[in-house]
Amino acid sequence: MRRELLLEKIDELKELMPWYVLEYYQSKLTVPYSFTTLYEYLKEYRRFFEWLIDSGVSNANKLADIPLETLEHLSKKDMESFILYLRERTLLNTKNKRQGVSQTTINRTLSALSSLYKYLTEEVENADGEPYFYRNVMKKVSTKKKKETLAARAENIKQKLFLGNETMEFLEYVDCEYEHKLSKRALSSFRKNKERDLAIIALLLASGVRLSEAVNLDLKDVNLNMMIIEVTRKGGKHDSVNVAGFAKPYLENYITIRRGRYKAKKTDLAFFLSEYRGVPNRMDASSIEKMVAKYSQDFKIRVTPHKLRHTLATRLYDATKSQVLVSHQLGHASTQVTDLYTHIVNDEQKNALDKL
């Protein structure tokens, strides 16, 4: 979603919210939470507040009128009723006829509510320097996490990684073969964005940055002489990220055509641009996701930008056998997250031995 559209949707949701949610939103901007995260949280709050009114827990006529006391006195039984509602509600905007949302969605909803309750009961200060209230019902609500061993997760992910020679084969496929299957109209669009698309894919495969980090990259953040990019990690931490050398020609080719092809001016700071009717804009996450899905599905299997991040991490661990190095490359504070890649690499080694 384009940043401008995202901010518009956030403003629409803010108009519906009670004053204490608006305070929460303003507070989290200073952390900073990303606008994408805050947008998703606001959507969860809207769903929760709508349920409070529809279920009769609150007598308010509109969401903005739900008093703080409703949240303060909400019982564990009330919250469990809300969770049950999520499990049983009919899914909207989908061909899937099953009832209820997934456990992952429920966990995301509860995470958003936990963040709001923590703010109201611990972080905010009233005129006396105290939080608005102390009772946090979310601490009494347990979440059910998806049970899956690292080995099982590694097996599921492994099939969606472009390991070994497949990393360069994927880039070469997009560069040299993909266009032969296209109609004249599709070919024109492909050729306009070919250098940019290749640069994005190469950067993701060569650095392992998150999609949001690639989207928010500015021209000034890219140093091709040192093959380093400056990114803002989760939690607002700034980081310098090394980029593998194989991405350099793709990035150089894109920079060569960026200004002329996308009508970029000095005021257009974004590194990856799209252009519509002569107006350049920062390329949004949704467009990159669709682009990666399109090329990868035609090459081998449909994947997400996050799978390209997993690809880099797995290849780096395979080459170095260092979880510390991989965690630093990915911007993780702990090596625990990188345990997954040891399982993937070990499976690859076992497969190689079986062929001897």
UniProtKB/Swiss-Prot annotation:
Residues 169-354 form the Tyr recombinase domain. It is found in: Cytoplasm. GO terms for cellular component: cytoplasm. FtsK is required for recombination. The active site is at 210, 234, 306, 309, 332, 341 (o-(3'-phospho-dna)-tyrosine intermediate). InterPro entries: CB, DNA_brk_join_enz, Integrase-like_cat_sf, Integrase_catalytic, Integrase_recombinase_N, Integrase_SAM-like_N, Recomb_XerS, Tyrosine_recombinase_XerCD. One of its GO terms (biological process) is chromosome segregation. Its main location: cytoplasm. Keywords: Cell cycle, Cell division, Chromosome partition, Cytoplasm, DNA integration, DNA recombination, DNA-binding. The keyword ATP-binding does not apply. Residues 16-121 form the Core-binding (CB) domain. GO terms for molecular function: DNA binding; tyrosine-based site-specific recombinase activity. The keyword Zinc does not apply. Belongs to the 'phage' integrase family. XerS subfamily. Site-specific tyrosine recombinase, which acts by catalyzing the cutting and rejoining of the recombining DNA molecules. Essential to convert dimers of the bacterial chromosome into monomers to permit their segregation at cell division. This is Tyrosine recombinase XerS. It comes from Streptococcus mutans serotype c (strain ATCC 700610 / UA159).
